[in-house]
């Protein structure tokens, strides 16, 4: 029987799932159970997990017939010591709970999802795959914050980076698409979704990334501010009397493109700009300005880029964002072919002009497949496993 992996991404109000064949890359089934704890939705995560199984069965995919060999769990933050795909046991769960404050929006529901899934599928190995893992070995100059060294050491404060599963997968796919060794490439990967990050990768290893201790640092995102002067936080706390929890919520949920323009759907944002909406236009300009700022910084770090790749929802589907991000960079060897960029397409594709020194690609990310393959990789490495 073909072996498969169930991949789960458990959030506070939803559970996304996918069943894949890691060897072939075939997606057997996927879906999402939403509105957990809300009216009309699943009562709790245990009910949501039953909803996953019910949805699979309704599509003719019964658990006992799927050939499942593992359950893979996306976990956003692995902290300083969880940086490889890890088989989950009680010790790992306890450690993940300790790491909750580093990713308060993401880690606690992920842990809850792991616990529920282990109860539901106790005979399968459960593997945690961490967004931070790819960036564990960032150069010290990139990973270190210029704060009191003793405080940073005592509290494990460093730049961890996120979306690592996506950045690694896309950088490897770029090399495969170009049919050149990964080790030979200097790359910039732009993961542009509701959450957004950029990485600089040399020879398959990251040398810089935009997110830091938490997923709040870096680019302007759908609802997150990205880079902000820490003084803003102190000012709002002292002068506006805002509790720290309210400031954190604002920076996570009511900032970014939504905070400036009241909208996170870029299709609607473009429509509003065309209709003369000043707030939407400013939100977009701030978003693009920050994106170009990071691209320029990473070009300086790399010296030059062999490949720049766009991925995730906005990166894969918004030709205007891609054009505006790279306009005027011909002096750096970066030119987009307008026709290729504007042409709808599926799968990996080149959008750079013929003869341009830097190849610009659009590559769909597939974090679920990467997680599934990470699961079978760690299982295959266990003593006694084939």
Swiss-Prot record:
In which domain of life is the source organism classified? Bacteria
Which InterPro entries does its entry note?
A: Ac/propionate_kinase (IPR004372), Aliphatic_acid_kin_short-chain (IPR000890), Aliphatic_acid_kinase_CS (IPR023865), ATPase_NBD (IPR043129)
Record site: Transition state stabilizer: 163, 224
Q: Which UniProt keywords apply?
A: ATP-binding, Cytoplasm, Kinase, Magnesium, Metal-binding, Nucleotide-binding, Transferase
Q: Which gene encodes it?
A: ackA
Task: Summarize the subunit comment.
Answer: Homodimer.
What PANTHER family does the entry give? ACETATE KINASE, ACETATE KINASE-RELATED
Q: Which Pfam families match?
A: Acetate_kinase
Q: Which residues form the signal peptide?
A: none
Function description: Catalyzes the formation of acetyl phosphate from acetate and ATP. Can also catalyze the reverse reaction.
What does the Swiss-Prot or TrEMBL cofactor note state?
A: Mg(2+). Can also accept Mn(2+).
Pathway where it operates: Metabolic intermediate biosynthesis; acetyl-CoA biosynthesis; acetyl-CoA from acetate: step 1/2
Look at the named UniProt entry and state the broad enzyme category this protein falls under. Answer: transferase
Q: What is its EC number?
A: 2.7.2.1
What is this protein identified as? Answer: Acetate kinase
Q: Which organism is it from?
A: Mycolicibacterium gilvum (strain PYR-GCK)
Annotated localization: Cytoplasm
One GO cellular component term, please give it. cytoplasm
In the record, the note on similarity to other proteins reads: Belongs to the acetokinase family.
Q: Which residues bind substrate?
A: 74
- What cofactor does this chain's UniProt record say it requires? Mg(2+); Mn(2+)
GO MF annotations for this entry?
acetate kinase activity; ATP binding; magnesium ion binding
Q: Which reaction does it catalyse?
A: acetate + ATP = acetyl phosphate + ADP
Q: Which HAMAP family match?
A: Acetate_kinase (MF_00020)
